[in-house]
């Protein structure tokens, strides 16, 4: 949505397609790319990014760091964990992290986190450059309806950018109706 919520100028929420407790590095990398989409779009359209995607950047940094330090998803550092996180179990949040590694390893962790984020940022930029016509179509639709969800958004993004969108009955609905069905993409296990 482009409707402001608190300090946020817009809002993106991802709901899982299916319940899964296991995530792969490629799933996390795709999530990084998606979260950096707003930042990359601002750079593409306005020439520089604003403070708008600051929460997205926090999220990306947190995920990339966890990939390296908690889940052993770094080719360079291998399947190891770094640091011990103290959690407040009843509140469900972390309160402190004990560092149990050297300054050299800390630098390698930072390098890996930076690499993951930079690769995701470049993927986001390239995707938006390649699909700029669809990006512009999405912007135009959001300016009219303010919020898009699930299947409608998926169909809009997979529609032909040259076809008119939205349909003429848009004014009578809160959200643009879905375009013709696109072929389903295979799902990851």
What feature does the model see in each segment?
Residues 1-189:
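Soluble catalytic regions of large protease machineries
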